[in-house]
């Protein structure tokens, strides 16, 4: 799976798998090294806590974050679709 948009995108087995992995990584975060990795984050609506938690987690794991909040100053204002914007962001990021 490349993108997780909704919990409905996950089967019950996959959800359980992810929860077990999260539990293991929570006990020993040194297993994760995201240095030299870039995460793209696109927030079309204000979501301060969610955005900050994603950015904080990525930075704590050694990675960087690029992104956008809202559509002001983006090509969306010129008519670019969400899908096109997501494709471009994916080219500039690893996650």
Predicted segments, located by residue:
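Phosphate/diphosphate ligand-binding glycine-rich loop within oxidoreductases
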Residues: 34-95
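Positively charged, low-complexity intrinsically disordered leader regions
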Residues: 1-56
């Amino acid at each position: 799976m490349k993108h997780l948009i909704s919990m409905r995108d996950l089967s019950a087995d996959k959800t359980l798998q992810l929860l077990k992995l999260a539990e293991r990584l929570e006990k020993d975060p040194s297993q994760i090294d995201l240095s030299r990795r870039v995460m793209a984050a696109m927030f079309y609506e204000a979501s301060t806590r969610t955005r900050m938690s994603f950015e904080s987690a990525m930075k704590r794991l050694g990675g960087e974050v690029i992104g956008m909040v809202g559509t002001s100053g983006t090509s969306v204002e010129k008519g670019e679709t969400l899908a096109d914007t997501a494709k471009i962001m994916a080219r500039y990021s690893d996650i």
